[in-house]
Amino acid sequence: MTSSQSPEYSRFTTGNFSLNEMVTTGNFVIYIVELFFCFIAFPLNIFFIIIIANTTTLHRNLRILLISTCVADAIYAISRYMILIPLLVAYLFNTEISSVTYCWLAKSLHHWVLGASGVTFFVVVMERSLASFLYRSYESESCYQSGFILTGFQWSYGFFIVAINQLDLMGTPQIYPRLPCQIEYSTARAIFVAVVAGAVMNITAVLTFRKVVSFNRTLFRQRSFKLTSLTEIYQISENVKSISLLIPIIVVMIVSNIFSTFTISINVYVYAAVRETPVEQRSAIATHISGRGNEISQVYDLCAIVTKLAFCWGIRAHPDLYKKWCYMFGKVKISPKKGISDTNTTTNLTGLDGKKLTFTVIEETQHHFDSLAQVWK
């Protein structure tokens, strides 16, 4: 690749602009907002990893997928810092601290984890569909290989997108008219493949999600109070709770896709507007439409980092995970009294509100589904 110190690179990079002028004020403001979200997303995903790793209320396959996604989201925040800090330094101090090779590696890492986390909804829905349709045996049988298979697919997909881009990038001119970390190292064909593949998987996931919700609702309404299999009861319970965990994620995904589609539409419009014009006029026309710093395209970056907070928002929808979240920060204090008299047998235990704490099998099942009813509301 062309060195950022070569005269050719400097001539095409700076042009009539100084280094700090290459980053517009609009770029700078959006970068600050994005870094703020990254600053929040990174520790929250780390906390979420700790919570999931220490919970026993989720099936191992679901825990594997959620931890994998949180790792990708945390790395995504790091990759954005790697890309944006050199641009902020250029704006504030008129100094270039990066190189083409550094920014190429940073953006390759960024695209890899973005691709991996982009199929999160798909792999989680696939795992939950297996858990729902195989609820009689999913918990009792060793079905753990599906979690590793889906996780492998998740990361392989992201790497596949990067590999396609690098193959398509070979042979293209290595003259860059912008700062190294402002350059988009992705080709149009690679972006097209990623968009189409992501759209197909998301549509499939949404349709499957609707089927899973319908199936679990039917199962809930046709429940039998003579059910005695604890594994079956547990799996039905976890299916209901995990569905509520997915709802915030799909809401954020839909909103993000709307804004992302808007951004892509602007880029398509720019391309259509300049393709019939002389080469020397294309830059001026594109700048007039999307801004000198291409600020409109940064809407996608903001949408991407907001989706990294989706799982953290999802904690609130999952009763057990939210309880652990509160316990981690001291909002829930459990101080059981020890030394209870032996005369208080387990069959007579009552809570402070006077309600029974122990039940027969039928009473336990009724109490269990009463709790589930609160989740469905």
UniProtKB/Swiss-Prot annotation:
InterPro entries: 7TM_GPCR_serpentine_rcpt_Srab (IPR019408), GPCR_Rhodpsn_7TM (IPR017452), NRL-GPCR1 (IPR052860)
Cytoplasmic compartment spans: 53-73, 126-146, 210-245, 316-377
Pfam families per the UniProt record, alphabetical: 7TM_GPCR_Srab (PF10292)
Protein name: Probable G-protein coupled receptor F27E5.5
UniProt-annotated location(s): Cell membrane
GO molecular function, one term: G protein-coupled receptor activity
High-level lineage: Eukaryota, Metazoa, Ecdysozoa, Nematoda, Chromadorea
Protein family (similarity comment): Belongs to the G-protein coupled receptor 1 family.
Bilayer topology: Multi-pass membrane protein
Transmembrane segments: 32-52, 74-94, 105-125, 147-167, 189-209, 246-266, 299-315
Keyword annotations of the record: Cell membrane, G-protein coupled receptor, Glycoprotein, Membrane, Receptor, Transducer, Transmembrane, Transmembrane helix
Cellular compartments per GO CC: plasma membrane
Glycosylation site positions: N16
Extracellular topological domain residue ranges: 1-31, 95-104, 168-188, 267-298
Superkingdom of origin organism: Eukaryota
PROSITE patterns: G_PROTEIN_RECEP_F1_2 (PS50262)
